[in-house]
A protein has these predicted regions:
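A shared catalytic/ligand-binding motif for oxyanion handling
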Residues: 1-182
Length: 182
């Protein structure tokens, strides 16, 4: 990535945004942090409620939501980054959204994921396999994977199961780097 300046990205599991007071506190906090991009997981919006997430100033808001009041992800992109959107891909259950575009003449893709509580490693592995042709060195993947990928993230002596090992193999094959673990 040869972007002349930095790109600030915040990712948060918001654990439901149905309460107005929580939405207002979140909006104020995001305004104060002033990131270029903010990725939210577990918004729990229904299709008719996405308008409830509002921010002052120039922010484009994209949602991936299911029919039930669970899961849900959102991505907020500031106008100050001059991000030209080329493509938005999302699933119907509200577990991921991928936005591809350009900034400073560089192609960039941002994916935010909220993996289901049950079968998270398998879900993420299938998703990464499905979008691997879209992933390159200018792809940023954030979110709540609902699984511990390495032993340091696990309590006591819990072992990594076969599904997580398969996910780690997929991550290695696609050549993804966990910036928090390098």
């Amino acid at each position: 990535m040869v972007i002349g300046t930095y790109i600030s990205i915040i990712t948060l599991n918001v654990n439901r945004l149905n309460a107005p007071s929580k939405r207002h506190r979140l909006a104020e906090w995001i305004q104060k942090q002033d990131p270029y991009t903010c990725c939210l997981q577990e918004t729990h919006f229904r299709p008719r409620n996405t308008y409830r997430l509002k921010l002052r100033g120039g922010k484009k808001i994209f949602h991936a939501i299911g029919n039930q009041k669970k899961a849900g992800v959102a991505m907020l992109i500031s106008d100050k980054i001059d991000f030209k959107i080329k493509n938005v891909t999302r699933d119907k259950e509200g577990h991921y959204i991928m936005i591809k575009g350009t900034t400073q003449e560089e192609n960039i893709a941002i994916i935010t994921i909220y993996a289901p509580n049950i079968g998270a490693p398998q879900y993420i592995r299938q998703l990464l396999t499905a979008v691997k042709e879209e992933i390159d060195s200018n792809t940023i993947i954030v979110g709540d994977f609902n699984t511990s990928l390495i032993p340091i993230d696990r309590s006591s002596k819990m072992k990594i199961n076969k599904e997580t090992e398969a996910l780690n193999d997929t991550i290695d094959q696609i050549d993804l780097i966990d910036i928090y673990r390098t």
